């Protein structure tokens, strides 16, 4: 390059300046080619001051340099350019080859893309990942494991489409060719069948293991097992869809197991309830007993003692602890406002067996009845929802689940019915029997609200079939006790004033009237069953109250004949009952939002004012209104006389 610069008479400074100019002045507006020519323009050396010899010498040197350039530099430059041309030609050939290959690859890519557009869906449809296969075979069965069931079910549907397309020999068009299965499709089908069988076998073993756990000697809460099964509830529909007979066998095995489970569980629970201590309500708790002439504080000739063997046997001691009965206990028994809590309390928690076995509190029979039947209802509810959610079959209906529940709980129902029979058979607690009837009514409506099948309602109807006849027997007993009551004119004793010598039977109520008033108010309170209207006249309670009322009026008529003014005596006693009924009626209107929760004490000073609001009266039971009107009519009749 130095020789070339010398031949072209290029100054180094000029050359450097040219490089700097081309590098830095990129925004220069002049033509770069013109600038180059201007900078590289050959300038002949000035010969003004040179001698001819010097000029000759200079020309010789120039000639020598030119010859050297021609003989040495130019050939090398020619060789370099020739080699460069050859290399450029080779590069051009390589580029042509690359271009040709690129076109070939582009064509191949387009071809493969066209093919993959048809093959990729098939691969995605038929592919089963190895990780999924490993999880199906070895993975823990839990909520995430159920995704394998969904995957296999989807694959089975896709495989069935390919099978149907293969069977269709006329399907030759290109549009449906993508749905034609590959040659090794049969092997894929075999793999799918194997995986289905693995899922079926593992699911079956899981369900059987849970059923065996319920049958173990160590007590295991059934709801814990049910919750574990509900977390993997997709396994049973898969069994049902692929092996219906196996699904039915598993469900039947579960039903047999739960039948045994509930029978054992409730047998132990009933034994615990049997240990409960109950109040002694015997034949001494009768109308006419506990009065001045029929005191039970000592041995006497009370008329009610005549019926002490009316419905009793020695077996009654198995349920009731015999304790001395006092007049105060009899008087307290006829007031049941505290016992109404069992019908109005919002907390419906069942008494656990440990508490029942260690409870030293005296209980009434409705406590045992409600706890047992409420426990059965709660378990029926849980079992119903589990059968519906886990063991659902195609086309399952309400009647089939009802049949399964009845199969599971029938032994339990039989034991509960036997317990109820033992509970009331030797007991004279007429209020306890009636409260138990109201508890059964409430449980019937609660089961309907929960959507429980009719089997539980049928069970409660069976309980009511036992309770109502026993109630009628006790009504007969009370009516007979009323008819045997002593015919006297003794007035009632009041707290703080035990002397009755200054009280006249014409101005103060008879002691039997006060006792009957408490009894009647308690009975009428229990006439309120539930919010849904029913035909009250169809209930035995309606006619029973009328029977008791008629027998009481017969006794009062006999007692009035021993007074100077029978009409005034009857008017005084009926007025007392009428005022009691007015108080009850008034409080039913005040507490209309919760018609079964009353506070009788706060109404002691209420006069003869009657609530005449028709809207409020509609919430008061018919028997209360009729009884109130009946005594009102009697008061008016005897007052006019």
Curated annotation (Swiss-Prot):
One of its GO terms (cellular component) is GARP complex. Residues 81-110 form a coiled coil. One of its GO terms (molecular function) is syntaxin binding. GO terms for biological process: actin filament-based process; endocytic recycling; Golgi to vacuole transport; intracellular sphingolipid homeostasis; positive regulation of macroautophagy; protein targeting to vacuole; retrograde transport, endosome to Golgi. InterPro entries: Vps52, Vps52_C, Vps52_CC. It is a peripheral membrane protein. Keywords: Coiled coil, Cytoplasm, Cytoskeleton, Endosome, Golgi apparatus, Membrane, Phosphoprotein, Protein transport, Transport. It is found in: Golgi apparatus, trans-Golgi network membrane; Endosome membrane; Cytoplasm, Cytoskeleton. The modification Phosphoserine is found at residue 602. Belongs to the VPS52 family. Present with 3130 molecules/cell in log phase SD medium. Involved in retrograde transport from early and late endosomes to late Golgi by linking the vesicle through the t-SNARE TGL1 to the Golgi, leading to the membrane fusion between late Golgi and endosomal vesicles. May also be involved in the actin cytoskeleton organization. Component of the Golgi-associated retrograde protein (GARP) complex, also called VFT (VPS fifty-three) complex, composed of VPS51, VPS52, VPS53 and VPS54. Also interacts with TLG1 and YPT6. This is Vacuolar protein sorting-associated protein 52.
């Amino acid at each position: 390059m130095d020789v070339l610069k010398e031949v072209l008479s290029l100054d180094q400074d000029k050359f450097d300046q040219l490089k700097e100019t081309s590098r830095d002045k990129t925004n220069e507006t002049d033509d770069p080619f013109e600038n180059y020519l201007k900078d590289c323009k050959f300038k002949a050396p000035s010969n003004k001051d040179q001698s001819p010899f010097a000029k000759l010498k200079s020309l010789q040197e120039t000639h020598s340099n030119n010859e050297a350039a021609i003989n040495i530099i130019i050939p090398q430059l020619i060789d370099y350019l020739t080699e460069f041309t050859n290399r450029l030609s080779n590069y051009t050939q390589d580029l042509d080859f690359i271009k040709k290959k690129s076109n070939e690859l582009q064509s191949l890519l387009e071809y493969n893309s066209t093919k993959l557009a048809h093959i990729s869906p098939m691969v995605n449809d038929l592919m089963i990942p190895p990780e999924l296969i490993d999880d199906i075979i070895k993975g823990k069965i839990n909520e995430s494991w159920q995704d394998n069931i969904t995957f296999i079910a989807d694959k089975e549907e896709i495989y069935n489409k390919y099978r149907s397309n293969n069977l269709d020999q006329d399907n030759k068009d290109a549009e449906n060719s993508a749905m034609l299965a590959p040659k090794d499709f049969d092997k894929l089908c075999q793999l799918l069948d194997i995986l289905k069988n693995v899922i079926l076998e593992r699911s079956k073993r899981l369900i059987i293991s849970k059923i065996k756990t319920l049958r173990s000697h160590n007590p295991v809460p059934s709801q814990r097992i049910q919750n574990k099964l509900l977390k993997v509830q997709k396994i049973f529909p898969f069994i049902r869809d692929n092996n219906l007979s196996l699904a039915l066998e598993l469900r039947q095995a579960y039903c047999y197991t739960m039948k045994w489970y509930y029978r054992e569980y409730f047998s132990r629970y009933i034994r615990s309830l049997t240990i409960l201590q109950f109040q002694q309500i015997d034949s001494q708790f009768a109308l006419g007993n506990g009065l001045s002439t029929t005191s039970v504080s000592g041995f006497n000739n009370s008329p009610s003692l005549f019926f002490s063997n009316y419905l009793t046997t020695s077996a009654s001691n198995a349920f009731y602890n015999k304790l001395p009965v006092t007049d105060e206990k009899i008087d307290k028994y006829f007031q049941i406002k505290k016992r109404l809590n069992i019908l109005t309390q919002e907390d419906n928690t069942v008494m656990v067996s440990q508490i029942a076995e260690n409870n030293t509190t005296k209980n009434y029979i409705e406590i045992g009845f409600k706890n047992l039947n409420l426990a059965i209802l709660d378990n029926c509810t849980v079992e119903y929802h589990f059968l519906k959610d886990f063991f659902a079959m195609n086309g399952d209906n309400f009647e089939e689940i009802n049949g399964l529940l009845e199969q599971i709980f029938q032994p339990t129902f039989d034991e509960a019915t036997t317990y109820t029979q033992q509970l009331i058979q030797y007991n004279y607690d007429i209020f306890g029997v009636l409260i138990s009837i109201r508890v059964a009514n409430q449980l019937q409506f609660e089961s309907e609200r929960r959507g429980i099948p009719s089997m539980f309602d049928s069970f409660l109807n069976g309980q009511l079939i036992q309770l109502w006849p026993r109630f009628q027997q006790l009504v007969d007993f009370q009516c007979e006790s009323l008819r045997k009551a002593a015919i006297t004119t003794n007035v009632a004793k009041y707290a703080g004033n035990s002397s009755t010598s200054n009280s006249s039977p014409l101005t103060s109520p008879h002691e039997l009237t006060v006792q009957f008033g408490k009894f009647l108010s308690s009975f009428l309170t229990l006439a309120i069953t539930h919010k849904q209207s029913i035909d009250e006249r169809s209930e035995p309670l309606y006619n029973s109250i009328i029977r008791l009322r008629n027998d009481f009026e017969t006794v009062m008529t006999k007692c009035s004949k021993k007074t100077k003014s029978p009409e005034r005596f009857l008017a005084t006693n009926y007025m007392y009952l009428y005022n009691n009924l007015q108080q009850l009626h008034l409080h039913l209107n005040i507490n209309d939002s919760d018609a079964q929760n009353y506070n009788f004490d706060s109404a002691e000073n209420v006069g003869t004012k009657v609530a005449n609001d028709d809207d409020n009266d509609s919430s008061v039971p018919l028997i209360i209104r009729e009884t109130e009107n009946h005594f009102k009519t009697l008061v008016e009749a005897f007052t006019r006389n």
